[in-house]
Amino acid sequence: MITHPQFDPVLISIGPLAVRWYALSYILGFILFTFLGRRRIAQGLSVFTKESLDDFLTWGILGVILGGRLGYVLFYKFSDYLAHPLDIFKVWEGGMSFHGGFLGVVIAIWLFGRKHGIGFLKLMDTVAPLVPLGLASGRIGNFINGELWGRVTDINAFWAMGFPQARYEDLEAAAHNPLWAEWLQQYGMLPRHPSQLYQFALEGICLFAVVWLFSKKQRPTGQVASLFLGGYGIFRFIAEFARQPDDYLGLLTLGLSMGQWLSVPMIVLGIVGFVRFGMKKQH
């Protein structure tokens, strides 16, 4: 079993100011978005100009941050924030939801498209291939922080990793499983899936490869966005089987996690949209 390397979450600290790895992962994601966006403009595969891409980035950042935070509040810890509403603004303490961020970006795309006279689906198709590497960057940020670890796996698995931050979850799991209790006593930690890296590979690298390559030629309007939607939903649904369920929610109906249930409509809409738009002529 490998022990998580325990990175310092603060990259640089100057007086009261601190630059955190997790914040840097978001910044890197936005840089990658801009870089890939400019490549697509040069290839003639974008509805953006260089100027409008930079303008949209501001809208997108607001959508990610506001949507991600509100999504986390509503989907995961609503009762806690209802009791302490001012904690909603403590974004430095963590707590972001991809599904909320996704909805925030969709709203930003709709508003931006209305302002600039760009069709919603055409804009979605343009944005979709630029997103997955940013998701990959965010998962690396999760790994560096030692958060969102995976479920318990076999002690002899070469990929097994112990997370010191999971002490409470380790104790709780060991209390219900004699073998795990033995492992915990012997090794001090339980072997877990490094699910952040699985999500990095699936939702980040694999999704990027699929959507980027598919969108290298003109496709029917809406099909690229549908591929991203369904692809993310499928990859996230799979990765959630290795990820530790949120301690304040656990597993829900049918033994699925909140992340899986939120991914189901993405999968359905993505598949239906991909087939439906694919039956139309390119325009």
Curated annotation (Swiss-Prot):
EC class of the enzyme, as a word: transferase
Binding site for a 1,2-diacyl-sn-glycero-3-phospho-(1'-sn-glycerol): 139
Pathway note: Protein modification; lipoprotein biosynthesis (diacylglyceryl transfer)
Gene Ontology CC entries for this record: plasma membrane
Cysteine pairs bridged by disulfides in the record: none
Signal peptide: none
Keywords: Cell inner membrane, Cell membrane, Membrane, Transferase, Transmembrane, Transmembrane helix
MF-aspect GO terms: phosphatidylglycerol-prolipoprotein diacylglyceryl transferase activity
Transmembrane region(s): 17-37, 56-76, 92-112, 117-137, 194-214, 222-242, 255-275
Subcellular location: Cell inner membrane
PROSITE patterns found in the cross-reference section: LGT
BP term (GO), one: lipoprotein biosynthetic process
EC number per UniProt: 2.5.1.145
Recorded topology in the membrane: Multi-pass membrane protein
Similarity comment: Belongs to the Lgt family.
HAMAP family: Lgt
Reported function: Catalyzes the transfer of the diacylglyceryl group from phosphatidylglycerol to the sulfhydryl group of the N-terminal cysteine of a prolipoprotein, the first step in the formation of mature lipoproteins.
Name the UniProt record assigns to this protein: Phosphatidylglycerol--prolipoprotein diacylglyceryl transferase
Species per Swiss-Prot/TrEMBL record: Neisseria meningitidis serogroup A / serotype 4A (strain DSM 15465 / Z2491)
Gene: lgt
